Structures are given as C-alpha cells and as structure tokens.
Curated annotation (Swiss-Prot):
Molecular function in Gene Ontology: ATP binding; ATP-dependent protein folding chaperone; unfolded protein binding
Modified residues (Phosphothreonine): 173
Biased segments, Low complexity type: 578-588
Pfam hit, one: HSP70
The name this protein goes by in its record: Chaperone protein DnaK
Region spans: Disordered: 576-612
Upregulation: By stress conditions e.g. heat shock.
Gene3D superfamilies (alphabetical): 1.20.1270.10, 3.30.420.40, Actin, Chain A, domain 4 (3.90.640.10), Substrate Binding Domain Of DNAk, Chain A, domain 1 (2.60.34.10)
Family: Belongs to the heat shock protein 70 family.
Function noted in UniProt: Acts as a chaperone.
Comp. bias intervals (Acidic residues): 596-612
Length: 612
C-alpha cells in the first residue's frame, strides 16, 4: 500500500509528516524548514505558496492568509478577477505540501490524514475534506488536532494507563481535549474549544497597542495604512516570539509613514509585563474550555496525569503559567508544539496502512446533533462528546392533522432553541398518508462516520418511504464544483511545473552564455578567428532568444551553442595537453644535461685547525 502522509493544515503554518520504519518523520520543505506558512499569493497569474508568499505579502495585495478561519462558510475572496473559496485556497496549500512530500519520498502520494481543530463543526470538516479532494488527495481520515497530538505523545507509552489533557493553542483556533491512554487505546473523553481564538489574536493586541501609542505621539492612525499595517503585523509577531525568551524587546520600524514635517519612525520598547497585561483577557478566555472539558469528562484537575501543550502560541510564558495554575501540573515539554500534530496524523496514516499495530483511536463528536421540533425547539439526538463512529434513531410524528410532508431541519450546537444553533442542512420527507396529528411514525436516524461527517435519514415507518442526506453546509461544494476545482488544480499544477521548467531553461541558457564568454577569453589567440566568430554569433543568438523569452527558441539556440562550446573546450584541452608535453620535453632535456655533472667529494677544514 502506498504511503499515507499526515498533514497538519494550520491557520498560520502547516506541516507534513510520514511514517518511516515505524517512526513518524517531519518532511522539510524546499527551503529546509519543517513548517510552511499557510499563505497563498497570486502575482501576474502565478501562484506562490509558503515562505515566498509570506515575504512579499507587504507589497502584494493579492495575498491570502489565515483562510482556515473561513472554512465551512460562504466566504469568497476575489483575486485577479476570479473568486476563490476557502476550500480552493486550502487546496493550493495542500498541493504544495503534497509536492514536497513526493519529492522527499520519491513516489506519488495520493492519500492523506488531515487534522482539524476538535471544535470544528460538520461544515468545516466537510470543507477540509473537499480541499483535500481538490488537491488530488484521497482523505483517508479527518482527525482532531489534540487527538493527533496525543497519538504522537503516547505511541511509546501505550502500556501505561494515564489521563492526559491536550491544550492546543494554534494560530487561529483553540482546543482542549481530555484523553485516556492504555493498552493501545486512545479514547477521547471530552473536547471543548473556541474556533475564533488563537495566536493571531495575541498579535492583534500588540498591533492595537502600537497603533494607539503612535497615534498618541504623532496624531496619525496607522490602522488606516495597509502597507504600515502589514509591517506592524510582522513586527508584532516577532515581538510576541521574542518575549517568550526575553523580558523586553525593541520594536523599530523606520519610515513607517510620513507626516507634514517628513518621514516618521516607530520606536518602542515592549516589556513582557506589558504584553501579559494586554493579552490577559485572551489567556483567561482559554481557561473556560479547560474547565468545561474537565467537567464533561467528569474529572478534577488532580486526576490529570500529564498536560501536553500544542501550537506555537503555547510558548507564551503567561499561557504556560495559567495552565499550570489551573491544573496544578507542569506542562510536558517532550514534544515540539509545532510538529506534534502532523506526527500524530502520520501515525494514524500508519494505522490505516497496517504499519502501526495495536493502536485504536476513539474520537468524539465536539457538538450535539439534532433536529428542530415544534415551537423551534432543538431536540438533541446525539450529545456532544459521544464516541464516534456512532448512530442514533428517534421516532417523531406530525404536528398537524393530514400533514403529508415533514421538513427535517438538521442542527449542531448546545443551545435549547434551534435559531441559536448552526444549521447543517434541511431536507423533506413527502408522501406521508393523511392522518390525524401524532399518528404517523417518522423515524429520524443520525449516523456519524469516523471523520465526524454526518448522514441523516428520515423514514415513514407506515409506508417504508425514506429520504436521506449527507450533510453539506450552505457553503458546501457540489460534486460538479469539486470536479471543476480538481481539474483547475491539476491544470495549475501543470502550469506551475511548466513555469518551473521554463525558469530552469532560462537559468541554464544564462549560465551557458557566461561559460562561453569565459571559454573564449581563455582561448584568446589560441584558436582561429572563424571559430571565435561562430561562437560569438551563436552566443548573441541565444541572448536574443532569452530577451524574447521564447522557450522553444531558447532550447534550440542553447543546444547549438552547447555543441560549439564543447568543440572549443576540446581545443582548450588539446592546447593544455600540448603545453604539458612541451614542458615534459624540456624537463627531459634538463635531465640529460644533468647526467654530465660529476659529484665531487670535499673535506671541511675548520678555522682553528688552519691557525695551528
């Protein structure tokens, strides 16, 4: 069976890993980094992904960041006259990760396990699966990020029974899960979280502080200046990271904007204490889901054996201090918070291929599922934190006499009224025989698969007629749309490969022009003028082709010049060989002359002896 890669598709950074020899390994990207920024940019029809896209984000308005925050919504971003959905943008990132995984493995990759925040609802999970499909990946399993982290942490500890709390603070989402490990079984007891809280919010409080301080000093609001704002964002992210290791950091942004008197600079010292004051409300916001997860698992903080921190933002000292205070436990530092989720996904990939044995993963559904019943009430069929896969049925009836159809409104959430919860979908069961209200028996069944994706069925028990739906959100893509996007993604991948080949051909041509000039210089006066002219003409023809940027012409002219340069190089070697021979002959003559020399014996006479 081909390799199944594990992908942590993050809000700010993504990571890919694979199981090799029973051990999960993070695959470094082309720049040698183990994580890749989840950033996509478009420039003159060309797509850029990762570090290169992030670097030019200040000057390129066609840059998309943190798209994960919009998964499962009808959000679209218009770039160069085309609308892109979050699924398409995520697919571009996944294609990039897939490409460098293939380069590392030396084989085609078609299967993946992709992680999502534990608190992702059905629409967000479905959107992630669609993104994988568009990228040309068969998504074997969608697993929760904290669960993946627990897999990576606990793989070599499955013989010990322990309860662990995974605190996952990523770039844009926050999750906490309580799991029990033992006998190779990873069972999720509870999960809670906030999909609108992450490292980006910690950056934002620093940005707001910088904007306020600059406005106080100079009377100019930098938040209205797009270019300045991007520089502030980069500086805030760097300051946040610096303050994890030092107690104060200097933020220096020269020429941030211009005032009436000329250019203005931003110079400010940010202390860790000030940052902790600015972000205290965010740290406190993460504590409510921790308490909720413990309560749902029916555990006290003292019953937790280990706390695992996941996500780059858990390096913030105030976050570590808060979790220690809440649980009474020092967080486990044996895993890299940026990589552990991808490693866990790779292990799950190994479970699927059979490379990892005796490991069973029992995940849970993060939110309750049910339908709308009379009076707009939300009737739960499956409670949150139910182990998946699972199914549940309940019999309902009609609300009015002679009702021949029922609308099934499927919802996900925890609020008692339907209007306050998330609509997953609607469908209708028709042709119910007319009868007094309360007589027809309508069985509604919910089925959640191992990826957390929901199927709902309604059946009239009297007639046996049934209707079912695989839940797709209002923003969900139809099969035709997905197929179109898959095709476009493949075409773009081909275009990217063609563009790469063109760049390589141009680079080789430039190198050949330089090499030709060097060879001609070395052969000056050693070959006849006709050969030199022939080489110069071919070189000029290649330079002209490079200027016109006609790839086929560049290839042809490059091959012509290559042949001439090879002939000239042969001349150069011949000249060198002749010179060596001549030198060898001269040495031999010198040797013959040396043969006539007679060695004479001599006796040293000391001065004191001659004086006697």
């Amino acid at each position: 069976m081909s390799k199944v890669i594990g992908i942590d598709l993050g809000t700010t950074n993504s990571c890919v890993a694979v199981l090799e020899g029973g051990e999960p390994t993070v695959i470094a990207n082309a720049e040698g980094n183990r994580t890749t920024p989840s950033v996509v940019a478009f420039k003159n029809g060309e797509r850029q992904v990762g570090e290169v896209a992030k670097r030019q984000s200040i000057t390129n308005p066609n840059t998309i960041m943190s798209v994960k925050r919009h998964m499962g919504t009808d959000y679209k971003v218009e770039i160069e006259g085309k609308d892109y959905t979050p699924q398409e943008v995520s697919a571009i990132i996944l294609q990039h990760l897939k490409a460098y995984a293939e380069s590392y493995l030396g084989e085609t990759v078609s299967k993946a396990v992709i992680t999502v925040p534990a608190y992702f609802n059905d629409a967000e999970r479905q959107a992630t699966k669609d993104a994988g499909k568009i990228a040309g990946l068969e998504v074997e399993r969608i697993i929760n990020e904290p669960t993946a982290a627990a897999l990576a942490y606990g793989l070599d500890k499955t013989d010990e029974d322990q309860t662990i709390l995974v605190y996952d603070l990523g770039g844009g989402t926050f999750d906490v899960s309580v799991l029990e490990l033992g006998d190779g079984v990873f069972e999720v007891r509870s999960t809670a979280g906030d999909n609108r809280l992450g490292g980006d919010d910690f950056d934002q409080v620093i940005i707001d502080h910088l904007v306020a301080e600059f406005k106080k000093e100079n009377g100019i609001d930098l938040s209205k200046d797009k270019m300045a704002l991007q520089r502030l964002k980069d500086a805030a992210e760097k300051a946040k990271k610096d303050l994890s290791g030092v107690s104060s950091t200097q933020i220096s942004l020269p020429f941030i904007t211009a005032g009436e008197a000329g250019p203005l600079h931003l110079e400010l010292t940010l202390t860790r204490a000030k940052f902790e004051e600015l972000s205290a409300h965010l740290v406190e916001r993460t504590m409510a889901p921790v308490r909720q997860a413990l309560q749902d698992a029916d555990l006290s903080a003292s019953e937790i054996d280990k706390v695992i921190l996941v996500g780059g933002s858990t390096r913030i000292p105030a976050v570590q201090e808060a979790i220690k205070k809440e649980t009474g436990k020092e967080a486990h530092k044996g895993v890299n918070p940026d990589e552990v989720v991808a490693l866990g996904a790779a292990i799950q990939g190994g479970v699927i291929t059979g490379d990892v044995k005796d490991v069973v993963l029992l995940d849970v559904t993060p939110l309750s599922l049910g339908i709308e019943t009379m009076g707009g009430v939300f009737t739960k069929l499956i409670d949150r934190n139910t182990t998946i896969p699972t199914s549940k049925s309940q019999v309902f009836s009609t609300a009015a006499d002679n009702q021949t159809a029922v609308d099934i409104h499927v919802l996900q959430g925890e609020r008692p009224m339907s209007a306050d919860n998330k609509t997953l979908g609607r469908f209708q069961l028709t042709d119910i025989p007319p009868a007094p209200r309360g007589v027809p028996q309508i069985e509604v069944s919910f089925d959640i698969d191992k990826n957390g994706i929901v199927n709902v069925r309604a059946k009239d028990l009297g007639t046996g007629k049934e209707q079912n739906i695989t839940i797709k959100s209002s923003s969900g893509l139809s099969d035709d749309e997905i197929e179109r996007m898959v095709k476009e993604a493949e075409e773009n991948a081909d275009a990217d490969a063609k563009r790469k080949e063109e760049i390589e051909v141009r680079n080789e041509a430039d190198q050949l022009v330089f090499q030709t000039e060097k060879t001609l210089k070395d052969l000056e006066g050693k070959v006849d003028e006709e050969q030199v002219k022939k080489a110069n003409d071919a070189k000029d023809a290649l330079k002209a082709a490079i200027e016109k940027n006609e790839i086929e012409d560049i290839k042809a002219k490059k091959d012509e010049l290559q042949t001439i340069v090879q002939e000239l190089s042969m001349k150069l070697y011949e000249e060198a060989a002749k010179a060596q021979q001549a030198e060898g002959g001269a040495n031999a003559e010198g040797k013959k002359a040396d043969d006539n020399v007679v060695d004479a014996e001599y006796e040293e006479v000391k001065d004191d002896e001659t004086k006697k």
